[in-house]
């Protein structure tokens, strides 16, 4: 105890000596600084604060003072909650407000790193709102200039983030800051570009910041959703933005009020905003040039943001793996396709048209117009999209987003001055490189029935995917490649280009993962109220799984071969392919099969040497066995490989003919034993093994 008492005595005497020395030599900096050091180390906040204030006033040129002030201000910017940092913050709070402001300004002036200087100045603006008028716009412009000088490739960078999220709200919400309209539009443009790019950043961009990781982990939605996106130059906390869309629309509203737009009071839905913009467009020609320019900007920016928000919502719902964060659940992606579920319907042949004439659709559908035939805007309305709620729980909201995005796009291109301004913005933002947007535009074009444009858009999509290193899914081609193939197939089919349809379908078959159970009844057709639209005008959102896509592919192939099989011209090969494909979802195709049997009966004979390789349906086997009997019409069937050559050979005898009959009987018996085989495996083998033959049939 004695030793401790001695120490306390010495410390106390030292303090007294310093106080005495300070009184004797008030102009001596070393004495003042020594006293400050003792009080700071003892964590006596009030005393240390007074001494720091005295040094700041009396010794402003001392580097040690500024080093100390810099340490304190760094603590203000630091998110850490350790004891030392909290003490330094408390020390700063003891200083008079005027001194705090002056300190922040001086430290900022001495900082030559643009990012650090901006963060210092931002600290000043937040603590002293009255300084926004003097320094706010200058800081904003400095950040935008730094972004240009540093040649940032992406708008999602540290300078833009500080400007859009931190500085801009301070500027535009301070009514003492006078801003011309053109500057407000410039800032709104910068904010929109940043937030949209931030929200829609792809997993590829994210992975570049995360460093090399295992590919299988990157493809896992659960792993991806737990990763944090960090903007280079900022901390993890500073890089996270809560409710970016909400922030963007708040900026839109504030800019709108400052620019005297026709604003509505209260919160309005995206549908309400779009409806208001449509109304405003009707009266645009009635305004003078100044008002016209003002409301043009209102329509362009309001409609554009509604478009991007809803297009993102749609793509994020059908292909969440494109985006990072908690919005990427382990959900199967969906793909928009023409509905061909009525493929088992009867065939109506136009006798005046050549069977292969383009845009003559299968299954008696009405002619699908190409963009060369009619105005797409009239055709692209009121098409019904079928979606199974089990595959997309929020299907109503997703389809509403798709509708709002389409209508916004149409409005932006409905008037020349809107088109011109929106195109200018898109060029500046390089939206043609946005993979997610190209996915939406492709689906929109398919919806509009502009299939030639859709094919071009899909090729553009493939080029975009090629420019981004896509991780491979083990055992499959990339998901994007499969999506493109099936959508190309559906577009070629709608154009009546059946050989190209089959080519894409058969390419896609290589990626199917087997076995797939054939459920008999269609798995892809949810119960729905049939809309009163023209027959065959429906679309459907199908899951990108082998279970859903393979049956759809087989439907497309059946639709392609149907017209050729049931023409006046005989084509046993096409008819045979149809019979093989009709096994899927049996007995849905029973009526079409009976039509095929009737055609065979009219012909009196039928040759299809692949019959026993791929027909395993017991009802079909029984029907063909019956056709050979007296009661069945004693139809001459050549269903065995090389059977035709045997019969046509000049040495044909009754014995050989009898042998052929015996071979047929044995083949039928063997075939009956195969009826338990997985039909989808059989049909998959049919598509893979007979690819050349299938394509030749459609040539």
UniProtKB/Swiss-Prot annotation:
Keywords tagged on the record: Isopeptide bond, Nucleus, Phosphoprotein, Ubl conjugation
Primary location: nucleus
GO biological process, one term: RNA polymerase II transcription initiation surveillance
Annotated InterPro entries: Int_cplx_su10 (IPR026164)
Modified residues (Phosphoserine): 220, 370
Record localization: Nucleus
Cellular-component GO terms for this entry: INTAC complex; integrator complex; nucleus
Linked residues for Glycyl lysine isopeptide (Lys-Gly) (interchain with G-Cter in SUMO2): 453
One Pfam match: INT10
Superkingdom to which the source organism belongs: Eukaryota
Assembly notes: Component of the Integrator complex, composed of core subunits INTS1, INTS2, INTS3, INTS4, INTS5, INTS6, INTS7, INTS8, INTS9/RC74, INTS10, INTS11/CPSF3L, INTS12, INTS13, INTS14 and INTS15. The core complex associates with protein phosphatase 2A subunits PPP2CA and PPP2R1A, to form the Integrator-PP2A (INTAC) complex. INTS10 is part of the tail subcomplex, composed of INTS10, INTS13, INTS14 and INTS15.
PANTHER family in UniProt: INTEGRATOR COMPLEX SUBUNIT 10
Family: Belongs to the Integrator subunit 10 family.
Function recorded in the entry: Component of the integrator complex, a multiprotein complex that terminates RNA polymerase II (Pol II) transcription in the promoter-proximal region of genes.
Protein name: Integrator complex subunit 10
Species for this entry: Macaca fascicularis (Crab-eating macaque)
Organism lineage string: Eukaryota, Metazoa, Chordata, Craniata, Vertebrata
């Amino acid at each position: 105890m004695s030793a401790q008492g001695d120490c306390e005595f010495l410390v106390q005497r030292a303090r007294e000596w310093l106080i005495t020395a300070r009184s004797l030599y008030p102009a001596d900096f070393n004495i003042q600084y020594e006293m400050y050091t003792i009080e700071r180390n003892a964590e006596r906040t009030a005393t240390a604060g007074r001494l720091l204030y005295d040094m700041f006033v009396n010794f402003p040129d001392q580097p040690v003072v500024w080093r100390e002030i810099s340490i304190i201000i760094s603590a203000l910017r630091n998110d850490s909650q350790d004891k030392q940092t909290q003490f330094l913050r408390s020390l700063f709070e003891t200083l008079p407000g005027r001194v705090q402001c002056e300190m922040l300004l001086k430290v900022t002036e001495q900082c030559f790193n643009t990012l650090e200087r901006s963060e210092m100045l931002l600290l000043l603006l937040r603590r002293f709102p009255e300084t926004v008028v003097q320094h706010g716009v200058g800081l904003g412009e400095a950040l935008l200039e730094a972004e240009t000088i540093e040649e940032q490739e992406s708008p999602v960078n540290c300078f833009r983030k500080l400007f859009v999220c931190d500085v801009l709200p301070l500027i535009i919400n301070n009514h003492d800051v006078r801003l011309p309209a053109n500057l407000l539009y410039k800032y709104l443009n910068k904010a929109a570009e940043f937030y949209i790019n931030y929200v829609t950043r792809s997993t590829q961009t994210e992975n570049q910041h995360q460093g090399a990781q295992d590919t299988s982990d990157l493809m896992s939605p659960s792993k991806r959703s737990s990763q944090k996106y960090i903007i280079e130059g900022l901390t993890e906390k500073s890089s996270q933005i809560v409710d970016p869309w909400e922030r963007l629309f708040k900026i839109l509203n504030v800019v709108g009020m400052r620019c005297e737009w026709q604003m509505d009071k209260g919160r309005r839905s995206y549908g309400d905003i779009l409806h208001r913009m449509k109304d405003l467009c009707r009266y645009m020609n009635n305004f003078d040039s100044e008002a016209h320019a003002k409301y043009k900007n209102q329509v362009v920016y309001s409609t554009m943001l509604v478009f991007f928000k809803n297009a993102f919502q749609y793509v994020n719902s059908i292909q969440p793996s494109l985006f990072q964060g908690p919005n990427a659940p382990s959900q199967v992606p969906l793909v928009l396709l023409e509905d061909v579920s009525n493929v088992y319907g009867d065939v109506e042949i136009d006798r005046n048209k050549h069977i292969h004439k383009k845009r003559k659709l299968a299954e008696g559908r009405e002619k699908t117009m190409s963009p060369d035939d009619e105005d797409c805007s009239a055709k692209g309305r009121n098409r019904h999209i079928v979606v199974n709620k089990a595959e997309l729980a929020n299907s109503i909201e997703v389809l509403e987003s798709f509708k709002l995005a389409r209508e916004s796009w149409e409005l932006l291109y409905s008037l020349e001055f809107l088109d011109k301004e929106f195109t200018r913005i898109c060029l500046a933002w390089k939206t043609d490189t946005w993979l997610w947007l190209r996915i939406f535009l492709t689906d929109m074009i398919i919806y509009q029935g502009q299939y030639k444009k859709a094919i071009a858009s899909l090729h553009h999509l493939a080029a975009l995917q090629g420019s981004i290193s896509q991780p491979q899914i083990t055992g499959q081609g990339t998901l994007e490649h499969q999506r493109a193939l099936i959508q190309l197939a559906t577009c070629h089919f709608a154009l009546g280009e059946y050989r190209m349809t089959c080519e894409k379908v058969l390419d896609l078959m290589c990626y199917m993962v087997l076995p797939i159970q054939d459920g008999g009844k269609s798995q892809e057709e949810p119960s729905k109220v049939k809309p009163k639209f023209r027959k065959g005008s429906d679309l459907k959102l199908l899951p990108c799984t082998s279970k859903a896509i393979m049956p759809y592919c087989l439907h497309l192939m059946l639709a392609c071969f149907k017209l050729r099989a049931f023409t006046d011209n005989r084509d046993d090969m096409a008819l045979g392919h149809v019979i093989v494909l009709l096994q899927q979802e049996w007995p849905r195709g029973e009526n079409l099969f009976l039509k095929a049997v009737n055609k065979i009966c009219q012909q009196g004979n039928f040759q299809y040497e692949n019959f026993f390789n791929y027909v395993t349906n017991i009802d079909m086997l029984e029907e063909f066995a019956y056709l050979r009997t007296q009661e069945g019409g004693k139809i001459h069937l050549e269903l065995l490989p090389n059977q035709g050559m045997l019969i046509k050979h000049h040495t044909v005898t009754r014995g050989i003919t009898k042998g052929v009959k015996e071979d047929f009987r044995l083949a039928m018996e063997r075939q009956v034993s195969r009826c338990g085989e997985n039909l989808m495996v059989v049909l998959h083998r049919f598509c893979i093994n007979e690819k050349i033959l299938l394509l030749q049939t459609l040539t």
